[in-house]
Amino acid sequence: MSSPELTYDSFSKYFPFAPTALCIKECARLEAMRQLQVEGPILDVGCGDGLFAKIAFRAEEVWGIDIDGKEGRWAQASRAYSQIVLGDIAEVKLPPAFFRTCVANCSLEHVPDIQAALSTISASLVPGGRAYLFVPNRDWASKFLTVRTLRSLFGERVASVLQNGIDEFFKHHHLYDEDGWRNVIAKSPLSLVDIKPVLSTATTVAFEAFLLPSLAGWANKKLTTRWTNFPGLRRAAAPFAYVLAKSMLAIANDDEKTAEYLLVVERPREPE
């Protein structure tokens, strides 16, 4: 890998509380976040259990918002946030012109009314405040080895059935290429500062490799609201799991950024 999408520092903090497949993707986003200038107060959209924010942010004031009350309780317990808001980002009322930074970590693609969500974010930012939005590439699932194998053996129609099924499983309401995401932002009150591809094909291949065993964590979350039950044991196993994850990234050996986009947008400054 030409860039450290997966480091032990991030992995060892994430792995005790999340399945391997999720760790790989989240750690790659963490590395991308470390290249950004993030100033508080911060709004974390789709904050989940708060683990990402606890590792990523050092600001004194971080607010989290999530539509899921169970996730909100875990977020509160994480002590990563000064405030937790339970509600739909497309409908909730937030303090106007309050946040200097907003981060949406692969959450907006799950919001049916994405324009309403972007309007809420814009109104909550100070003029000139920035939002960093991680969103999926329309064709991210086409890089799954199983999808590529089906395509080579049986053609595009058969492969697309599995590819579409993957996106349905992850409840993606919005999947666009770069031009599509540009159009989404153009229709919103926000201004596009930059858009760049992030997360390599290798992370998708590694994600797929660990997806089936990680489904046990998904089932556990449905039953208990948490990904893992024994964080202490997983912490001890983190070095071994990290070697396996890094090995899969090396086997995939594809640095092309095909999985997601990082949209850098800002609330326009008011004319003087």
PLM feature spans:
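Short glycine-centered segments of the SAM/dcSAM-binding site in methyltransferase folds
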Residues: 41, 128-130
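Short catalytic micro-motifs in class I SAM-dependent methyltransferases
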Residues: 106-110
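S-adenosyl-L-methionine-dependent methyltransferase catalytic module, highlighting the catalytic core
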Residues: 112-120, 130-264
